């Protein structure tokens, strides 16, 4: 196979100051070994946040929505959206301690092995004796196929699990898209270091090497020469990367050009944004803006490619985000993700177009009609705050100054002084972000630049390697 692009052959000011435990949890080892193997093992002590003054009789009258796990970026927003629809949110989680806000906000959480479908079905049945369960969903891609299976089992609205599973494997997804004539980068999958070397020689360097299954840019790297390719191959296949499936990597042609993300609900494109990344070899997003500066003709071409992706992959229910780069031959699809992108993307869509993607997803999950009408057109942009080194955060200030700037809509931090910072070239490298909204892109850029320049921090290097190694990043659901 050549390294050519393939055509048919083969992405209110709500100041979450010091949301530290989320970041702290992103820096410790995570294991599911202790998780109960069946719903029967779930104890009363495992069910957190349940209001004690609500009787079982009253519970039966309450409509509930079940969330399978949650995420670092969108999780809290999903809970808030459920409550806005006057539903009772219940999180099923292998590690309830991940969600540090549940106790303070009295959110019900049940401990269950979320990798065990039978255990989840059993827990659903148990909860069904006390609640009128209106729907089941998840913000996490890794559990979305499971959501589809549970919905099918209980005759609830939900995604097609087979389509989701196919889409979540980037190698299988790429094969389907190429067969349907959708422009994609040249690629091959590999399971051994020798295969990686062979495929890279065929495709050519630079090439992108990434896990076939995963999200959040975990394990994704641009390999510009043979040394970088060998190093990253060893990282992925040598036991350092945490796999949630059998080890399989994708070696793909590096496609250069402006990077865009389309946010979709059902089969309707709600908006297309443009993304800027930080320096290679990693793909950590630096800035995202909605709407992207596309001509009408470019927008129509992008929407056409999006629709072809949805049809080829059997998607069309619920949220999808599609990443593509614009090249000399037009849009080339990088990834199709059968979920909403993590915040700040949904925030930006709501600020730009007044469409609440998370709320509309919940409506779909409970069988209600969506309202995807765009009620305004503004420019919304987000800039990431990215640590400049590993170490311990000494201080971070200027948050109030940034938040007070007219046009700043949100300032979110994942850290506070004393938080250990370990960069890994993925979405957890962000220590926070700033969101701004304005009538034009130039105004939004001016506001966001002023806000970011108002924020300052200091990080002291770790004293030794041991200090750094004890803060291995957590495999947070996403």
From Swiss-Prot:
SUPFAM superfamilies: Glutathione synthetase ATP-binding domain-like (SSF56059). ATP binds at residues 214-219. It comes from the Bacteria. Keywords: ATP-binding, Ligase, Nucleotide-binding, Plasmid. PROSITE patterns: ATP_GRASP (PS50975), CPSASE_2 (PS00867). Pfam families: CPSase_L_D2, LAL_C2. SMART domains: GARS_A. InterPro entries: ATP-dep_AA_Ligase (IPR052032), ATP-grasp (IPR011761), ATP_grasp_subdomain_1 (IPR013815), CbamoylP_synth_lsu-like_ATP-bd (IPR005479), LAL_C2 (IPR040570). The active site is at 339. Residues 174-366 form the ATP-grasp domain. One of its GO terms (molecular function) is ligase activity. This is Uncharacterized protein y4rH.
